[in-house]
C-alpha cells in the first residue's frame, strides 16, 4: 500500500512482509529529499519495519549538504529502527552512484545489519523477504 506519493518519491509498505520500499523519481531538492527520508523513518517506526528497500534506480544526484545530513542526522535515527536488512537498488545516474558510494563508506562501519546492492526491484525484494 502506498503511504506517501510525491513527484520526487513514493513510499510503499508491505505490512505482511514488514517491508518498506522508498522509490525515488528523479531529482529531489534538499527539502524534498529530507521530507521523504523522514517520512520513511516515521512509517518504519509506525509499522515496525524490518526490511528497507531504497529504490534509487531513477534518482539523480544527492547534494553534498544532503549527504552530510544523511550521515549525521538521518543515520542515527535509522540505526534506532528494528531494520534487519537494507537493499539498495543502484541508480542509473553516475552522480548518484558517486554520492551513494561516499555516503555508504561513512555509514557502513555503523551498520549492524546486512546491506546488499541490486539492479532491480524484484531481485531486491526476493532477497529482503528471505529469512
Predicted regions and their residues:
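Amphipathic, Lys/Arg-enriched alpha-helical "gate/interface" segment within cytosolic domains
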Residues: 1-131
Amino acid at each position: 500500500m502506498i503511504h506517501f506519493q510525491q513527484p520526487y518519491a513514493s513510499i510503499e509498505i508491505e505490512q505482511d512482509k514488514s517491508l518498506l520500499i522508498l522509490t525515488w523519481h528523479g531529482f529531489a531538492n534538499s527539502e524534498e529529499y529530507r521530507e521523504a527520508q523522514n517520512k520513511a523513518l516515521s512509517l518504519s517506526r509506525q509499522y515496525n519495519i524490518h526490511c528497507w528497500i531504497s529504490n534509487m534506480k531513477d534518482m539523480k544526484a544527492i547534494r553534498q549538504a544532503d549527504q552530510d545530513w544523511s550521515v549525521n542526522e538521518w543515520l542515527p535515527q535509522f540505526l534506532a529502527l528494528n531494520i534487519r536488512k537494507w537493499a539498495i537498488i543502484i541508480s542509473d545516474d553516475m552522480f548518484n552512484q558517486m554520492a551513494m558510494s561516499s555516503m555508504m563508506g561513512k555509514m557502513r562501519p555503523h551498520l549492524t545489519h546486512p546491506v546488499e546492492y541490486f539492479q532491480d526491484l524484484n531481485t531486491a525484494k526476493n532477497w529482503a523477504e528471505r529469512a
